[in-house]
Amino acid sequence: MKSQMVSEHPRASAVRSVLRKLMGSGEAGVKAAAAISSDGLVIASVLQEGVDADRFAAMSASLLALADRAIVETKRGSLKQLLIEGTNGAVLLVQAGDDAVLAVSTDPGALIGKIFIDARSAAGELRVCLGG
């Protein structure tokens, strides 16, 4: 795991603390986490080696924007989260205020229900931390 420090963001340290708390002991299966601005910039991240934080952030923001548009078009209210499942795990994207997204990557055998609960809680902490 590597931590990416974004010195330009004044709350990066506090955000990283929330991300590390979400990752915890690894029991639930969270492998990586990132806080991303709605325009696709990394606020702070704790990602696996070999994952390009900037690319991950841009793709996550794009996916969330498309999902949000689909929710609006189908008149389903406001987007809360997006789950993408693959054969080697999942990626969960959760709104963390008007201008931020929490992205979580999991193991294949992750406890998705627990991760949903923990991610929503972390997104709430990020919302407060980032003032949004």
How does the language model describe each region?
Residues 1-132:
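Non-catalytic interaction/Regulatory regions outside core domains
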